[in-house]
C-alpha cells in the first residue's frame, strides 16, 4: 500500500463512518425503530457515499491512476458498513450503543493507524450523540 493509498483509505473510511452514523442518527431521531429499516437507510448512504467519493476522487484528477478512486470507494464502503453492523440483529438500546461504540472504535483505529490522535472533541461529540440517542430510544 502506497502512502497515497493510505491517505485515500483513511479519508474514505472516516467519511463512510461519519456519513453512516449521521443517517442512522437521523433515522433514530425520526422515530424509526426497526433494524431492517435502519439497515436499509445505512445501505443507501453506503452506496451513495461510495459512488460519490470514488467518482469525486477520480474526476478531481483524471490524469492520475484510477486506483486512487478505487481505494477511496472501497474504504468509504467499508467505513459505511461499520456503524450499521449492530442493527443486523434487530433494534434496541444495545444496538444503538453498539453502533456508537463501533463508530468510536473505528475512528480510533483509523486515527491510530495514521499516527494521529483523534481529537477529544470529535470523540466527545460521537459519544454524546450515542448516549443521547440511547436515551431517546429508551
Kindly give the residue locations of the regions a language model identified.
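Hydrophobic, small-residue-rich transmembrane alpha-helices and their short perimembrane loops
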Residues: 1-103, 120, 124-138
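Transmembrane alpha-helical segments of integral membrane proteins
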Residues: 97-115
Amino acid at each position: 500500500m502506497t502512502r497515497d493509498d493510505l491517505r485515500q483509505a483513511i479519508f474514505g473510511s472516516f467519511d463512510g463512518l461519519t456519513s453512516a452514523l449521521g443517517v442512522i442518527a437521523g433515522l433514530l431521531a425520526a422515530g424509526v425503530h426497526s433494524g431492517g429499516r435502519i439497515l436499509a437507510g445505512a445501505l443507501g448512504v453506503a452506496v451513495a457515499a461510495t459512488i460519490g467519493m470514488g467518482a469525486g476522487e477520480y474526476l478531481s484528477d483524471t490524469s492520475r491512476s484510477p486506483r486512487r478512486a478505487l481505494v477511496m470507494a472501497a474504504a468509504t464502503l467499508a467505513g459505511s458498513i461499520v456503524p450499521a453492523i449492530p442493527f443486523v440483529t434487530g433494534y434496541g438500546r444495545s444496538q444503538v450503543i453498539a453502533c456508537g461504540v463501533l463508530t468510536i472504535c473505528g475512528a480510533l483505529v483509523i486515527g491510530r493507524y495514521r499516527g494521529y490522535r483523534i481529537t477529544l472533541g470529535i470523540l466527545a461529540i460521537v459519544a454524546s450523540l450515542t448516549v443521547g440517542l440511547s436515551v431517546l430510544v429508551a
